[in-house]
Amino acid sequence: MPGKQSEEGPAEAGASEDSEEEGLGGLTLEELQQGQEAARALEDMMTLSAQTLVRAEVDELYEEVRPLGQGCYGRVLLVTHRQKGTPLALKQLPKPRTSLRGFLYEFCVGLSLGAHSAIVTAYGIGIESAHSYSFLTEPVLHGDLMAFIQPKVGLPQPAVHRCAAQLASALEYIHARGLVYRDLKPENVLVCDPACRRFKLTDFGHTRPRGTLLRLAGPPIPYTAPELCAPPPLPEGLPIQPALDAWALGVLLFCLLTGYFPWDRPLAEADPFYEDFLIWQASGQPRDRPQPWFGLAAAADALLRGLLDPHPRRRSAVIAIREHLGRPWRQREGEAEAVGAVEEEAGQ
């Protein structure tokens, strides 16, 4: 990716509610309980999965065809079952870099979410070999979204609409289960066909239950929500919310529409492009519209300014995308897909 060219109520009731949320690091009690329930369900699944791990060397069971992807923590291979010939994707995590608990966690999160059509289907087979842990998923053979983004151009508008609808549906599904995805970026969106009609989320190693306390571990990137860059409300960190995913989705959609990031870091004092965006966000005046946004239509402006609101409690939820699917998102393109057709492909 190139650079940033690269019923109102009594006042007392509201005050009490704000005080309660402040004591919970910005979460309501209901939100906190939802995350705790998700965490307990994952712990139960991990306990069961640990008891059913297949202990064998991968090459005894599967034949490697070719690599599908490589990351910091492991690799993904296209394999076939030696007896049945079934093609599968195998994610292999080396033991020196992955604990058993870390492996079981990612494996079980994927299992719990794979029923959605825009999320990679994980199969209930975990393998422990001498030097690695592995699990199997459906194979998606056309690479990730990054390879399809043309620098300074992005994707064709119909493909952006389809991608937005499907990713929003997948994220809504994740959030409804008390989880926050936390790693939305082109590299984690797999493309199912050369025409970019179907997309699937993958890689759930960073997914966490809502309310998990999180501190920023490294320098911020464009997808990092600004609340993660601020001092956390609790000593242990920021309780994570679905608003983190809404922010990342807004940044991703900007990239798909323009072919570059809206900014490098969401820090006004360090990034003039982000500072310009904040000025426009506050004023709403056309004269304050930053140059990188000039090619976008009014519907895209409204959508992205909602998803990229710097205040997480005011930020639009990912489902806001549905309101804008039937409109043009670029000024230079007049085509707009019918909302029903796009939503049908969202896999809801």
Curated annotation (Swiss-Prot):
Alphabetically ordered keywords of this record: ATP-binding, Kinase, Nucleotide-binding, Serine/threonine-protein kinase, Transferase
Enzyme class, broadest EC rank: transferase
A GO molecular-function annotation: ATP binding
Pfam families tied to this protein: Pkinase (PF00069)
Entry EC no(s): 2.7.11.1
Disulfide bonding pattern of the chain: none
Region called Disordered, residue ranges: 1-25
Active site (UniProt): 183
Residue ranges that the Swiss-Prot or TrEMBL entry lists as coiled coil: none
Annotated GO biological process: MAPK cascade
InterPro entries, alphabetized: Kinase-like_dom_sf (IPR011009), Prot_kinase_dom (IPR000719), Protein_kinase_ATP_BS (IPR017441), Ser/Thr_kinase_AS (IPR008271)
Residues that, per the record, bind ATP: 68-76, 91
Gene3D superfamilies: Transferase(Phosphotransferase) domain 1
Listed PANTHER family: PROTEIN KINASE DOMAIN-CONTAINING PROTEIN, SERINE/THREONINE-PROTEIN KINASE SBK1
Family designation: Belongs to the protein kinase superfamily. Ser/Thr protein kinase family. STKL subfamily.
Name listed for the protein in its UniProt record: Serine/threonine-protein kinase SBK2
Organism in which the protein naturally occurs: Homo sapiens (Human)
